[in-house]
């Protein structure tokens, strides 16, 4: 299943002087307007639910990754548990109370509240000292005619003091989707609001699409396969297991359109070499026109500063039908330069050069990139791999 997460970042309340969580929560509950929106970003992942829990991958990746969720999350909050953990805990371990019956569009719905004390909780929240169990409570709504759950809310107790947040509140909307002639109940939209100790907030809105079920004989790849041993006597300069040497300059064109209405970090991008890639002896390693494969690893909008910020990582170049691993940054690495083309854009020094992610800024109300031209230089792949998915 694919999840698309839009994360909105709201400024701290200007009139909030008491930074105690109780006062912040009380002020929020009495407030009748949303805080000022500072910016947003968008992230897209593939998610699979296996026996051990949820696993994730970038869109189009050949295998799922057992890495911690924060590897994919970047700088913003990202939650998991939408596919059963919260609901199972609420129904199996919760102290449940019936609240009321309500009519909506002529149909009855039943509303319940529940409490999960700490000793029954499976809700984990990451702190400076590792993961901590958190008690939580909430409500759920049942459709008695369809025998389905319609909505689940999850509200944590006050979070530990060694975290920047006071509380996290999730709202999960459920619906049925058809898989192999069966209508399966799944969450189709989730909203996660995090309230921080400085009174700022974030709101994650997650939409789930492309749900499918793996057959019993499907093989879930959770780790990269071992590279095959080199054949005896082989002196091939470049193989799929060998990356390009550092220091090679080249011009590239990203051909995948990047549109602010739909693009997200995690999306694959395709491009071509605009110039040949040559080694120090001036031999052509990859010709002009060779396909490039990469990925958007950052897509964010800063509203007050009025710009879009995108991060692109080139991952491989295709030579003779073989994909060669590639790690590169825009050149020059530590200088701001103009983006080729009519749009006002800047190539800026990367936040972390070892991540292998090139950073671009565009000052536009809407971003409609049909292509993106820039100069690059290869870097040591080992350095980029150390922060491979950040």
Residue ranges and their predicted role:
Residues 1-137, 144-150, 155-185, 189-246, ...:
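Structured extracytoplasmic
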Residues 136-142, 188-190, 206, 269-271, ...:
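Long, contiguous hydrophobic alpha-helical segments, chiefly transmembrane helices and signal peptides
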Residues 150-152, 175, 239-390:
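Contiguous beta-sheet cores, especially beta-hairpins with glycine/small-residue-rich turns
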């Amino acid at each position: 299943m694919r999840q698309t997460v839009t994360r909105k970042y709201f400024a701290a309340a200007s009139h909030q002087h008491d930074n105690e969580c109780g006062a912040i929560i009380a002020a929020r509950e009495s407030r009748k307007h949303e805080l000022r929106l500072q910016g947003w970003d968008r992230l897209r992942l593939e998610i699979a639910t296996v026996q051990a829990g949820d696993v994730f991958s970038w869109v189009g990746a050949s295998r799922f990754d057992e890495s911690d969720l924060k590897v994919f999350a970047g700088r913003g909050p990202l939650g998991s548990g939408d596919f059963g953990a919260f609901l199972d805990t609420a129904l199996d371990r919760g102290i449940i109370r019936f609240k009321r019956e309500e009519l909506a569009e002529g149909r009855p719905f039943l509303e319940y509240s529940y409490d999960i004390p700490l000793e029954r909780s499976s809700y984990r929240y990451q702190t400076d000292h590792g993961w901590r169990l958190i008690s939580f409570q909430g409500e759920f709504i049942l459709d008695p005619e369809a025998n389905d759950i319609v909505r689940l809310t999850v509200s944590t107790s006050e979070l530990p003091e060694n975290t920047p947040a006071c509380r996290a509140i999730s709202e999960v909307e459920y619906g049925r989707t058809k898989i192999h002639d069966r209508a399966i109940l799944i969450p189709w939209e989730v909203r996660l609001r995090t309230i921080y100790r400085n009174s700022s907030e974030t709101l994650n809105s997650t939409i789930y699409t492309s749900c499918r079920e793996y057959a019993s004989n499907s093989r879930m790849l959770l780790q990269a396969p071992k590279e095959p041993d080199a054949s005896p006597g082989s002196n091939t300069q470049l193989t799929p297991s060998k990356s390009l040497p550092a220091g090679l300059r080249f011009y590239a064109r990203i051909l995948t359109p990047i549109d602010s209405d739909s693009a997200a970090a995690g999306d694959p991008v395709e491009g071509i070499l605009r110039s040949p890639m040559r080694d120090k002896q001036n031999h052509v390693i990859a010709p002009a026109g060779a396909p490039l494969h990469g990925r958007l690893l950052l897509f964010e909008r800063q509203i007050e500063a009025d710009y879009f910020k995108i991060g692109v990582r080139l991952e491989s170049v295709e030579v003779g039908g073989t994909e060669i691993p590639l790690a590169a940054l825009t050149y020059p690495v530590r200088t701001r330069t103009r983006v080729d083309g009519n749009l006002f854009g800047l190539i800026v020094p990367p936040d972390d050069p070892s991540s292998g992610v090139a950073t671009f800024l565009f000052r536009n109300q809407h971003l409609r990139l049909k292509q993106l031209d820039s100069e690059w230089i290869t870097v040591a792949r080992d350095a980029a791999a150390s922060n491979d998915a950040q």
